[in-house]
Amino acid sequence: YKDIQTGVRQEVVFGGKYRKGYSIMPSLDYRKRDFFVRGLDVVLTANYNKNMTNNVDTSSYEYNWRGEMRPLRMPGEQSYQNTRSDNNNWNGTLTANYRIGKAHTFTFNHVINAFRRSNQSLLNEDSEANAIPKETRKNISGLSYRLMPTEHWNLSVFGKYYNQFIAGPVATSSAQDDYIRTTNSVSAMGYGAAGTYFILKSLQAKLSYEKAYRLPTNEEMFGDEDLETGDISLRPENSDNVNLNLSYNETFGKHSVYVEGGLIYRNTKDYIQRNISDLSGGKYGATYVNHGRVETKGYNISVRYGFANWVSVGGNFTQMNVRDNVKTVTSGTNQESLTYGARMPNLPYQFANSDVTFYWRNLWKKGNTLSVTYDNLYMHSFPLYSEAVGSESEFVVPTQFSHNLTLSYGIQNGRYNISFECRNLTNEKLYDNFSLQKAGRAFYGKVRVYFGN
């Protein structure tokens, strides 16, 4: 059960809108070394997720942040509904590694996902749209070869095949009172290569290139039947990705040091972007569109230090320069887009985190460990809308700096574990990428029992 407090914008407040449901998810994991033949290792995983979501928006009042309310002309704070959505999600993966001698490894990987959603209105007669289920099937197959003649270097080449089938209702009239079932299927080939080389014993370089595709998610295609509206005509993102990394890892007696730095370049086409749209009457919704081209240049730095299995401290800093790379307003014209070269909105571009953990091993009894962890996250302010539109100071998600504290006690080498966590320790004002305020200080407790050997 979850109360829906806000819409997709902070100024939209709900007082009687809620969502409830349940989920069942059995899973299977199978692993076998030397499967039928020596050198062939197989891993098979599968899970089934059946969940029901009931979106209820039947209030006859509208609210403000002070809790005050006034009658609505028509019931429904966002859109009058009491809708049940039954979602069935099947996932499976197969990974097979075949080693030939010490230098050659072939890997085959296949991921399959099947999704089906059926909707039912609990208020009145179902619409034609609800009579048509929303379905998708994804298949991603990959084959790679790795050459590792020595411990000093290795080289990998790989190919991937992507396929996605989509089916769902589409309106045939502007009044959206008549629907038909439409289907679409897309497929693509991805590929790439990666290599690593030890310049020194503790200094490693990594270089990779990939022609990659990202298939639209279920929410991007079908929405959430409430505040999000999907688009089944979305095209997959495709990008050229280049990564260069240098890492240093060394141990000096009881001291360990790890340092890594990386450069990132991505040239993305058909970038899938979430937008906030005005539905009139002070109501807003989220939609998804393909944005022609986006270019990303960035770097990240990670550092970690450990001492005698007693303390671990580290941090990470990332700078991502994600820019609109669409030059003209429409294809085939010379009119330059106002947002060309501007930073893409709703994306943090400078952020950092750090943490420190202390361990007390064999505390009170051998095999028991007490750990205390402090971590934080810094996020620089970033545009809420395109920098080319409006005042930069007015339309930004503000800078944020949050702190967390976790206490964990493991018993019998981790078979039993008790943990307590305080998120947002100093009760800072935190926001998501669309400036929706997150929860304040919160406390959590968790007990875990491992039943394996």
Q: Where do the model's predicted regions map?
A:
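Extracellular loop and loop/strand-boundary signature of outer-membrane beta-barrel proteins
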Residues: 9-18, 76-83, 123-132, 144, ...
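Face-selective signature of the C-terminal outer-membrane beta-barrel domain
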Residues: 1-2, 14-175, 180-181, 187-188, ...
